[in-house]
């Protein structure tokens, strides 16, 4: 079972969800390379799946957790409550959708007029999908990745701000093509689904370790 992580717009901190549903802050204090992990909350429902997508809804300040088994949770870090939303589905196909293992919201800012959209990656169909309404778990494909990706995927969206409001979004994903031992870093066109390596030299885009997620700082550093 893999854990996932995300930055929270409201306080700029990185959070991780462990394989037992614990929620942690992950910090690297200035002047040291030591990672400080502190438990701050706990999901009220057991995780159901092997691979998970995690991201904060920047508008609602809720932590979204989805799984390759179709689980769809929403957690409030302020009062530590978890809502079990409807399972992931892809109408008109009946039943729970399996294979969704990465998730990311657009428009990561604190502007109250900014809306946000949740995009996922389904590695069974190798597609980018919109999850809307997110609480209903309803999925609609936007396009194909263009690669045969393994189930172990991660995604995050970096928002470029001007005057505190998002003016551009860039999606990144860690994907493991069929036959590859470890993931590579891609940019994702969320509207067409197309995955593109971040480097022209494929070796430079490849991770040395089998990482399970990607979280981009809110400042891009």
Report the location of each language-model feature.
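Structural signature of eukaryotic scaffold interfaces centered on beta-propeller domains
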Residues: 3-11, 45-61, 95-114, 149-167, ...
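Conserved beta-strand positions in repeat-built beta-propeller and related beta-rich domains
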Residues: 8, 14-20, 56-58, 65-68, ...
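Structural motif
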Residues: 20-27, 70-76, 115, 124-133, ...
């Amino acid at each position: 079972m893999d854990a996932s992580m995300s930055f929270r717009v409201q306080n700029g901190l990185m959070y991780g969800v462990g394989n037992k549903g614990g929620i942690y802050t992950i910090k690297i204090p200035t002047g040291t390379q030591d990672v400080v992990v502190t438990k701050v909350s706990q999901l009220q429902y057991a995780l159901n799946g092997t691979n998970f997508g995690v991201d904060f809804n920047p508008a609602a300040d809720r932590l979204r957790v989805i799984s390759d088994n179709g689980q769809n949770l929403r957690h409030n870090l302020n009062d530590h409550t978890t809502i079990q939303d409807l399972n992931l589905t892809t109408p008109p196909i009946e039943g729970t959708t399996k294979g969704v293992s990465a998730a990311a919201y657009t428009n990561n800012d604190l502007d109250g007029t900014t809306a946000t959209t949740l995009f996922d990656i389904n590695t069974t169909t190798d597609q980018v999908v919109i999850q809307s309404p997110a609480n209903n778990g309803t999925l609609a494909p936007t396009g194909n990745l263009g690669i045969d990706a393994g189930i172990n995927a991660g995604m995050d969206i970096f928002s470029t701000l001007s005057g505190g409001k998002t003016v551009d979004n860039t999606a990144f994903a860690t994907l493991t093509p069929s036959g590859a031992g470890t993931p590579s870093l891609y940019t994702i066109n969320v509207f067409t689904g197309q995955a593109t390596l971040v480097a022209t030299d494929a070796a430079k885009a490849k991770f040395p370790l089998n990482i399970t997620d990607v979280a981009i700082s809110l400042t891009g550093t």
